[in-house]
C-alpha cells in the first residue's frame, strides 16, 4: 500500500472515530491516539528519515495534510461536544417555574411566647402597662415587703432556690410590684410577666416557669373591680361565654384573698390567685392604706396554656419535642 493510500485509510478511520466521540474525555484520548508523541501520525513522520530524498517532500506533504485534517476534525468535534455539554449543564440547572415549590420547615413562636403575648395584649387593652424586674432578688423584696414573715413555709430552703443568705431566685413576680410602687406614685395599673423559680417538678409543676401578676392601685378600689378585670380577662382569652368563680383563700399579701376558677370546655379549672392588697404591703412601700386601695392577681402562663390548649403534662412545654411543638 502506498503512503497516500495509507494516509487516506488513517484519515477515514480517524474521521469515523472522532465524529462518533460523545464526550471530551473520549475526544482527548483520540487526540493522543493520532497526534500524541507515540500517535499514528507521529509514527508516520518518523518514517521520513528512511525514504529516498526525492520522496521525502511528497511524503512530508501527505503526512502534514493528514495531520491538519485530523486536527480540524478534532477541533470541530470539540466545538460540538462543548456546546452539547453546555446544553446538558443548563438542563440540569433549569427550573420549571410552573412546578410547585419545595416544602420547607417554617419556624414559629413557642406556644408559651404566643400565650404570653396574647395575655399582655389583653391587659394592655384594659389600661395596664407591662413591667419587668430582676430574677435574682433579696428576701426583703421577695418576702418581707409582701407581708410574708420569716416563719412562712415559702421561705424555707426546701421550697426556694437560695444563692446565698442575702439572695435567692424569685419565687413569684410580686417583687416587681414592690419595686414599681417604690418608684411610682399611685394610681397605677401594671402586669409583670417573667420567669420564677420553685423547688417543684411533676406533671403540673416546673422548677422554672413563667408567671404574670397584675396590680391595680387607685382610690376606692373594691372586689367588684377585681371581679370585673378577671371576668374580662377570661372572656377575652377563652371566649365570651367563659365563666369564673371566686373561692375564699389565704395569701399573706392580700386580704381578702381568692382562688379563681375558670369554667371552660365543660369543666372548672383552678387557674389563679387574687385578692385585695394587704395594708401592710402598702405601708412597706410608703403608700397610705387609708387613702389607697389595690387589687392583685397572679397566674402561671404555662397553666393558662394547658387550659386553653388541653395540654395534660406541663413538662411537654419545655421538652423541645418538635412533634409536640409543631402542633401549636
Swiss-Prot record:
Molecular function in Gene Ontology: ATP binding; magnesium ion binding; phenylalanine-tRNA ligase activity; tRNA binding
Cofactor note: Binds 2 magnesium ions per tetramer.
Principal location class: cytoplasm
Keywords: Aminoacyl-tRNA synthetase, ATP-binding, Cytoplasm, Ligase, Magnesium, Metal-binding, Nucleotide-binding, Protein biosynthesis
EC assignment: 6.1.1.20
GO cellular component entries: cytoplasm
One BP term from GO: phenylalanyl-tRNA aminoacylation
Pfam families, sorted: Phe_tRNA-synt_N, tRNA-synt_2d
Cell compartment(s), UniProt: Cytoplasm
Cofactors (names): Mg(2+)
Recorded catalytic activity of this chain's protein: tRNA(Phe) + L-phenylalanine + ATP = L-phenylalanyl-tRNA(Phe) + AMP + diphosphate + H(+)
Residues that bind Mg(2+): 255
Enzyme class: ligase
CDD domains associated with the record: PheRS_alpha_core (cd00496)
Protein family membership: Belongs to the class-II aminoacyl-tRNA synthetase family. Phe-tRNA synthetase alpha subunit type 1 subfamily.
Subunit field text: Tetramer of two alpha and two beta subunits.
PANTHER family (UniProt xref): PHENYLALANINE--TRNA LIGASE, MITOCHONDRIAL, PHENYLALANYL-TRNA SYNTHETASE
Protein name, UniProt field: Phenylalanine--tRNA ligase alpha subunit
UniProt organism field: Fervidobacterium nodosum (strain ATCC 35602 / DSM 5306 / Rt17-B1)
Amino acid at each position: 500500500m502506498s503512503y497516500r493510500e495509507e494516509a487516506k485509510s488513517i484519515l477515514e478511520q480517524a474521521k469515523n472515530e472522532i465524529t462518533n466521540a460523545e464526550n471530551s474525555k473520549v475526544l482527548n484520548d483520540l487526540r493522543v491516539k493520532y497526534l500524541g508523541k507515540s500517535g499514528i501520525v507521529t509514527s508516520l513522520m518518523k518514517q521520513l528519515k528512511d525514504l529516498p530524498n526525492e520522496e521525502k517532500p511528497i511524503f512530508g506533504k501527505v503526512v502534514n495534510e493528514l495531520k491538519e485534517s485530523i486536527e480540524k476534525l478534532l477541533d470541530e468535534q470539540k466545538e460540538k461536544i462543548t456546546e452539547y455539554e453546555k446544553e446538558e449543564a443548563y438542563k440540569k440547572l433549569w427550573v420549571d417555574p410552573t412546578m410547585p415549590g419545595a416544602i420547607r420547615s417554617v419556624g414559629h413562636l413557642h406556644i408559651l411566647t404566643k400565650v404570653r403575648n396574647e395575655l399582655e395584649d389583653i391587659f394592655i387593652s384594659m389600661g395596664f402597662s407591662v413591667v419587668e424586674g430582676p430574677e435574682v432578688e433579696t428576701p426583703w423584696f421577695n418576702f418581707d415587703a409582701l407581708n410574708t414573715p420569716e416563719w412562712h413555709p415559702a421561705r424555707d430552703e426546701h421550697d426556694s432556690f437560695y444563692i446565698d443568705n442575702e439572695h435567692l431566685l424569685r419565687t413569684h413576680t410580686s417583687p416587681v410590684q414592690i419595686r414599681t410602687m417604690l418608684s411610682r406614685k399611685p394610681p397605677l395599673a401594671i402586669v409583670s410577666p417573667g420567669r420564677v423559680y420553685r423547688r417543684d417538678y411533676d406533671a403540673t409543676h416546673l422548677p422554672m416557669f413563667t408567671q404574670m401578676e397584675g396590680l391595680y392601685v387607685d382610690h376606692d378600689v373594691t372586689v367588684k373591680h377585681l371581679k370585673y378585670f378577671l371576668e374580662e380577662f377570661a372572656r377575652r382569652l377563652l371566649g365570651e361565654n367563659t365563666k369564673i368563680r371566686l373561692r375564699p383563700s389565704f395569701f399573706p399579701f392580700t386580704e381578702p384573698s381568692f382562688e379563681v376558677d375558670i369554667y371552660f370546655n365543660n369543666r372548672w379549672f383552678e387557674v389563679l390567685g387574687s385578692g385585695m392588697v394587704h395594708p401592710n404591703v402598702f405601708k412597706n412601700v410608703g403608700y397610705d392604706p387609708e387613702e389607697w386601695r389595690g387589687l392583685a392577681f397572679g397566674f402561671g402562663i404555662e397553666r393558662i396554656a394547658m387550659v386553653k390548649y388541653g395540654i395534660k403534662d406541663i413538662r411537654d412545654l419545655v421538652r423541645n419535642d418538635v412533634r409536640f411543638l409543631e402542633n401549636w
